[in-house]
Amino acid sequence: MIARVLPQGEIKVEALQSLIVSDIPEGQAIEYKSTINISDDKAKKNLCAEVASFANASGGDIVFGIAEKGGKATALEPLPDFDGDKVELQLRQIFNTHIEPAVPGLRFCRVEIASGESALVLRIPQSWSRPHALLAEIPQFPVRDGNRKRPLKLRELRDLFGASASIAQRMKQFRVRADASRP
């Protein structure tokens, strides 16, 4: 499993500033976005591909509100007119429309940069229901590979489907044993 770059739990502005000061590059567990671009279908599908690629790999964080150059964080860029609840609802609707199966466990963490200014960290867990496909004419199965996303190879896809079936079978066996042990 890949270690997270940002701390678990509440994320403070100091953690985001340390990404810049420490010259932390985008990688297997983190991606930087200066804005939340969901203005057109191409932008929505690109963001969905990022989410699915993290879920299909080891999970990770997408940080909205950090400018990057050459894959390295360069500056905090507060999100303009940020309404956390509205943005979360919009993003969840987009993800549920374009990713199958839905990615469980997404967390949206608002980070106050200054009075009235915010960034957003989208925490994507490694999914137990992977592989996740982008819905299109031909479904695509992206996976995070270092600081980029790429399509899953056929062998990897077979392995993930097999692992998913194995997890479902183990959960079913656990429930049967739990029910059998009840008085």
Question: Locations of the language-model features?
Answer:
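Conserved N-terminal catalytic/coupling substructures associated with nucleotide/phosphate chemistry
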Residues: M1-P183
